[in-house]
């Protein structure tokens, strides 16, 4: 019997299945409903209820910092385009990655303003405000650490509204400050809002992962409250008018894609309403509306919110808002992926190469797990030593399965052998492999990260398939060096073709993940030889492999 070997095959297949399932769940997550009120509001009703009108024509102004290149529409003050100069669109390209976009093919905008009964963005008060600006281009100059972009609007009643975007050097968090001067004789009720809207369907120029299932990650909306730290909300769910309606203090709303995110973070002590809406024409939205504020006659009111528009850099996002770093979605194994990434990042601070960091972390992980590996091989060796007795027992008892089972368990007990002893270490190792997959797919630091020679992007597949082939070779050597008692011809064929099957399967995996597996296999070969030498001294192993 070679149950441990069969368990290894099952374990590898299970890992592969879990990765595939993770991909499916990331593409199509189930909406979380325990903290939401499901509604079936129409698209027009949703927008009107939230006091968020559609944008109109205005003048476009540009804002450039060292990390952001934005285009803002003076009609409403919405951010309609966002380029990230520090992140190329593709490996080797001089074209910056575009996060926000407003074109006939695709809409992705960050809207904000003031609603409420007296708010200029309230549809009942007419078209959205057309702000005045002192110039059309703003640039963060060398030596300048902060850039302010003020926009002003005065309504028919003489009330003045100022919307100021505040940019800081090296920062993807943009503060949006509001100043409301009440020139009337009655209190003015206003409420800040922030909304992210996006086309559901991706055009070809944005669907970068369409040719590789391993590169698909979650794309959709998300929100956070003190009760629900991080909840996804699928675009298709919003498009079906199953909308979110949550009231909470604090929190944020966001739209996510692989490596990048946008988020609105309200900055107030009151209650915010988080919502989603189907805006029609294949466009969905997630946003917040803050608790109204009364500005007394002759007084000036101040409000603020924060927009994150950029890469998912965990430490920076955590500093902007609680749990915003959870948008780096490591899936259900986040509690393993996060420590692994912190360790990987710490190693990288010394070696300066993410590929070598993966190699080192593989040695560390496998070193920590060596006692489990040794226990696994010892258990498998003991099981092999019992095979003659088990075979004799089966011949003696014939087809009496019940007695076979009883005597086999008695034999295991007498010999102090746990038949599942070789399985537990495999079960423990599987989450490590899956967690590393999540880490590679979700960490912006590994995007376009080179290793050596032909590997220029550890988050992408090997363009020449050399690493998957090397992985298959190492798997073949492990198989050949492992003792076996398999006698069934079908099982023998399956075991023979396992390296080939997994080589084909790994062709489309991120090269960083395949690199981890190669190094892990090499460590297995080394540990295997060390363990076998110890087992030989105990009479539990022979260098002469049994013929099948």
Curated annotation (Swiss-Prot):
Report the Gene3D superfamilies cross-referenced here. Answer: 2.70.98.90
Supply the alphabetized keyword list.
Cell inner membrane, Cell membrane, Chaperone, Membrane, Protein transport, Transmembrane, Transmembrane helix, Transport
Transmembrane segments annotated in the record for this chain: 6-26, 350-370, 424-444, 458-478, 499-519
Q: Which domain of life is it from?
A: Bacteria
GO cellular component terms listed in the entry, alphabetical order: plasma membrane
Where it sits in the cell: the answer is: Cell inner membrane
Report the membrane topology from the UniProt record.
Multi-pass membrane protein
Q: Which GO terms describe its biological process?
A: protein insertion into membrane; protein transport
Q: Which molecular-function annotation in GO is an example for this chain?
A: membrane insertase activity
Q: Does the keyword Transmembrane helix apply?
A: yes
Which regions are flagged for Low complexity bias?
29-42
Q: What are the boundaries of the region Disordered?
A: 28-56
Q: Which InterPro entries match?
A: Membr_insert_YidC (IPR019998), Membr_insert_YidC_N (IPR028053), YidC/ALB3/OXA1/COX18 (IPR001708), YidC/Oxa/ALB_C (IPR028055), YidC_ALB_C (IPR047196), YidC_periplasmic_sf (IPR038221)
Do you know which PANTHER family this protein is assigned to? CYTOCHROME C OXIDASE ASSEMBLY PROTEIN COX18, MITOCHONDRIAL, OXA1
Summary of the function given for this chain in its UniProt record: Required for the insertion and/or proper folding and/or complex formation of integral membrane proteins into the membrane. Involved in integration of membrane proteins that insert both dependently and independently of the Sec translocase complex, as well as at least some lipoproteins. Aids folding of multispanning membrane proteins.
Q: Which family does it belong to?
A: Belongs to the OXA1/ALB3/YidC family. Type 1 subfamily.
State how it assembles: Interacts with the Sec translocase complex via SecD. Specifically interacts with transmembrane segments of nascent integral membrane proteins during membrane integration.
Q: Can you name this protein? A: Membrane protein insertase YidC
Q: What is the scientific name of the source organism?
A: Salmonella newport (strain SL254)
State which gene encodes it: yidC
């Amino acid at each position: 019997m070679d149950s441990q070997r069969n368990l290894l095959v099952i374990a590898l297949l299970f890992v592969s299945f879990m990765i595939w399932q993770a991909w499916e769940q990331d593409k199509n997550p189930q909406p979380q409903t325990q903290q939401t009120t499901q509604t079936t509001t129409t698209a027009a009703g949703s927008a009107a209820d939230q006091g968020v009108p559609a944008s109109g024509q205005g003048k476009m102004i540009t804002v450039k910092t060292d990390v952001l290149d934005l285009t803002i529409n003076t009609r409403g003050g919405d951010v309609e385009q966002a380029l990230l100069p520090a992140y190329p669109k593709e490996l080797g390209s001089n074209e910056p990655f575009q996060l926000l976009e407003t074109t006939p093919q695709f809409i992705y905008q960050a809207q904000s303003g003031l609603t409420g009964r007296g708010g200029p963005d309230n549809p009942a008060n007419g078209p959205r405000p057309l702000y005045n600006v002192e110039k059309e281009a703003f640039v963060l100059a060398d030596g300048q650490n902060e850039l302010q972009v003020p926009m002003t609007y005065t309504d028919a009643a003489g009330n003045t509204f100022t919307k100021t975007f505040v940019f800081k050097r090296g920062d993807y968090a943009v503060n949006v400050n509001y100043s409301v001067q009440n020139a009337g004789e009655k209190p003015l009720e206003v409420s800040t809002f922030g909304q992210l809207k996006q086309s559901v369907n991706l055009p070809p120029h944005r669907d970068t992962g369409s040719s590789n299932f391993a590169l698909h990650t979650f794309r959709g909306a998300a929100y956070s409250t003190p009760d629900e730290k991080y909840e996804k909300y699928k675009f298709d769910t919003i498009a079906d008018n199953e909308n979110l309606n949550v009231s909470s203090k604090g929190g944020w709303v966001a739209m996510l894609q692989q490596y990048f995110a946008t988020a609105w973070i309200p900055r107030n002590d009151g209650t915010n309403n988080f919502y989603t809406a189907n805006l029609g024409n294949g466009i969905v939205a997630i946003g917040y509306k803050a608790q109204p504020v009364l500005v007394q006659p002759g007084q000036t009111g101040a409000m603020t919110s924060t927009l994150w528009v950029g890469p998912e850099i965990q430490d920076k996002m955590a500093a902007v808002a609680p749990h915003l770093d959870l948008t780096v979605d490591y899936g259900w194994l986040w509690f393993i992926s996060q420590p692994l990434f912190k360790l990987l990042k710490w190693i990288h601070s010394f070696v300066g190469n993410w590929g070598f960091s993966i190699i080192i972390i593989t040695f560390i992980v496998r070193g920590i797990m060596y006692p489990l590996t040794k226990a696994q091989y010892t258990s498998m060796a003991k099981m092999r030593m019992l095979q003659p007795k088990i075979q004799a027992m089966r011949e003696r008892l014939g087809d009496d399965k019940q007695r076979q089972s009883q005597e086999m368990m008695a034999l295991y007990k007498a010999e102090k052998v746990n038949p599942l002893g070789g399985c537990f270490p495999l079960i423990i190792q599987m989450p490590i492999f899956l967690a590393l997959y999540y880490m590679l797919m979700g960490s912006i630091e590994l995007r376009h990260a080179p290793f050596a020679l032909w590997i220029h992007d550890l988050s992408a597949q090997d363009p020449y398939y050399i690493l998957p082939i090397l992985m298959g070779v190492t798997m073949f050597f492990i198989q050949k060096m492992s003792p076996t008692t398999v006698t069934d011809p079908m099982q023998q064929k399956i075991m023979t073709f396992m390296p080939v099957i997994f080589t084909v399967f790994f062709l489309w995996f991120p090269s960083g993940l395949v690199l981890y597996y190669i190094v892990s296999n090499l460590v297995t070969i080394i540990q295997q030889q060390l363990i076998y030498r110890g087992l030989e001294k105990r009479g539990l192993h022979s260098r002469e492999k049994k013929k099948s």
